[in-house]
Amino acid sequence: MYYAVKKGHATGIFNNWPEAQAAISGYSGAEYKKFNTKEEAEAYLINRDLWVEKVAADNKDGYLVAFTDGSYDKELNRYSYGVAIILPDGTEQDICGYGSNKEYIDSDNIIGEIFGVINAVDWAISNGYEKIKIYHDYEGLSKWLTGEWNAKAKASQMFVSLYKTKFEDFVKAEFVKVPGHSNVIYNEKADRLAKSALMDRKKVTVQG
């Protein structure tokens, strides 16, 4: 883990939290973030966002890009999903929704992750895209499709069956796992959309 301090008593990249904390403690207006890679930390210090650059490169290669996330609330007995789509021209499309299907509710937030991917791929096909790159933070989504993981639960079985019969022949989908809660702006946006749908019962498609 790397801690990048942009404004503080000392600036730069620190390899542990105590050192980073000493650099910002008591400093008014301190700016800092935590990253999984040194490359991301270095980019932050010079105001670069590697994920924005990565998405731009994907778009240039002709991919529709989608970041998906899911959420779940046990007390509400409800799951939700959020999708942040970036089109090749740089415009964005936001999708979110919720559900409480009793067949899938025992999968917690994983069913939300599943419906996020389903909605992203469905949107791509409906709008004439042939390639989509899906960034997600639950590795089962891709491993169920490749057979690396067995789809044992009803939710995962539904996902594999639907994908194979409805989507696979119509769009080329590439799955990329990203670390959850790691300052990836589009992933954080998908997370916010999912939480908004969960708490406010929003089910919308919004072009941004």
Please tell me what each predicted stretch does.
Residues 1-9:
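A short beta-strand micro-motif
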Residues 9-13, 26-37, 127:
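A short, exposed loop/beta-hairpin motif centered on an aromatic-Gly-Thr core
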Residues 29-54:
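Short, mixed-charge low-complexity intrinsically disordered segments
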Residues 57-111, 123, 202:
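RNase H-like nuclease fold core
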Residues 70-77, 118-189, 193, 202:
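RNase H catalytic domain
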Residues 109-110, 114, 197:
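Catalytic phosphate/metal-binding cores of nucleic-acid and nucleotide-processing enzymes, i.e., regions
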Residues 195-208:
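Charged phosphate-binding loop/patch that engages nucleotide di/tri-phosphates or the phosphate backbone
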